């Protein structure tokens, strides 16, 4: 169940290196909705940023998720459920010459999971501001619980290290490199999820037992990106990302995008992303027997699968408002369409001979609506 805390884990990457410039004073109101695979997640978010003395900046964010899940994992081994997650974040930035220091803290809480994270990032402009180097680390400590079992309580400790480099190669071309390493230790599997194994004594031909994961995991990701600005204020961008971990997963991501301004008030965006990964060493859709090996997983996100995403978006800068304290404002809408196809995860709800059921796949939609104001 806790996997719903991350709507789009495939899209996550190390933060890009950024110039040592404080963000503008602004407020953003967001509504986001995800629908796909029997899961619906939606909720609002509010983010406010404010500068002080041109050297300091603070930010605060609140986000609320409403989750309704009847995913294939849930309907085959449990019951559909609904829950709410609340996330609070606080951050501060300090600018000292060409160096920016950023400290952030995030708390997320739901009925069976509490997550806390603190991070420090440093960004430095070099070589006449044409190059930016950034590095940082984050520490997370989570508590995993299980609804219906008050005695169940496990922990997860996580360390994240990241490095970023961006460079202006020429007046129209920006390039970047990001590298990230994450180490996890603790209870890393889902307490609700089960694996299935061949059971001749069962009418279905198989039975279930709880998943068992290793209690450690180290993953690393490297990404190369580039953005080229066209003469008519448009831009094209591309990124390649490689991911690998100690569980045997290797993944590749390719993203291409185009941004096009229209007039003085409109900006349109088009994005395509392709993702492909191999399965974890201890994953199987159907194990030959109970306790077939030390570690057991049937989470489809640890299987071999491919996804495609096509996204479109538009931003409209609003005319001046009657409120003098708002310098400018805009409205943005983004829509992403995902397709997931699994190579070794089968849809057991379709019936059939165990291990020969149809392969699973589903479509998902993500909607995002922003209202932003600068003051």
Q: How would you label these PLM feature ranges?
A:
Residues 31-35, 64-68, 96-98, 107-111, ...:
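Transmembrane beta-strands of outer-membrane beta-barrel pores
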Residues 31-34, 74-79, 104-108, 119-121, ...:
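Extracellular loop and loop/strand-boundary signature of outer-membrane beta-barrel proteins
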Residues 61-91, 130-189, 193-194, 218, ...:
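Outer-membrane beta-barrel translocator/channel fold
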């Amino acid at each position: 169940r806790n996997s719903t805390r991350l709507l789009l884990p495939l899209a996550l990457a190390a933060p890009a290196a950024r110039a040592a410039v404080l963000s503008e004073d602004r407020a953003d109101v967001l509504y986001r909705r995800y629908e796909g695979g029997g899961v619906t997640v939606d909720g609002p978010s509010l983010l406010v940023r404010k500068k002080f003395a041109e050297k300091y900046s603070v930010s605060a964010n609140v986000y609320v998720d409403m989750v309704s899940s009847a995913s294939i994992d849930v309907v085959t081994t449990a019951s559909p459920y609904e829950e709410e997650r609340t996330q609070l974040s606080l951050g501060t930035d300090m600018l000292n010459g060409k160096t920016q220091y950023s400290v952030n803290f995030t708390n997320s809480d739901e009925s069976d999971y509490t997550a806390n994270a603190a991070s420090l990032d440093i960004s430095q402009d070099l070589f006449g501001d044409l190059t930016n180097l950034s590095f940082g680390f984050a520490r997370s400590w989570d508590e995993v619980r299980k609804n219906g079992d008050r005695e169940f309580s496990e922990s997860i400790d996580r360390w994240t290290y990241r490095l970023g480099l961006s460079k202006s190669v020429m007046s129209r071309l920006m390039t970047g490199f990001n590298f990230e390493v994450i180490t996890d230790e603790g209870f890393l599997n889902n307490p609700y999820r089960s694996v299935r194994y061949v059971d001749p004594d069962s009418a279905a031909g198989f039975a279930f037992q709880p998943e068992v994961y290793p209690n450690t995991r180290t993953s690393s990701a490297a990404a190369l990106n580039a953005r080229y600005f066209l003469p008519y204020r448009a831009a094209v961008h591309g990124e390649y990302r490689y991911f690998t971990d100690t569980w045997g997963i290797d993944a590749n991501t390719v993203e291409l995008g185009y941004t096009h301004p229209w007039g003085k008030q409109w900006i349109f965006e088009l994005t395509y992303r392709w993702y492909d990964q191999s399965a974890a060493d201890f994953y199987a859709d159907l194990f030959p027997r109970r306790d077939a090996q030390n570690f057991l997983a049937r989470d489809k996100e640890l299987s071999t699968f491919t996804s495609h995403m096509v996204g479109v978006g538009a931003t409209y800068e609003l005319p001046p408002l009657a409120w003098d304290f708002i310098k400018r404002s805009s409205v943005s809408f983004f829509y992403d369409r995902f397709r997931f196809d699994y190579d070794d995860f089968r849809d057991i709800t379709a019936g059939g001979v165990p291990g020969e059921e149809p392969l699973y796949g589903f479509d998902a939609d993500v909607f995002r609506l922003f209202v932003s104001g600068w003051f």
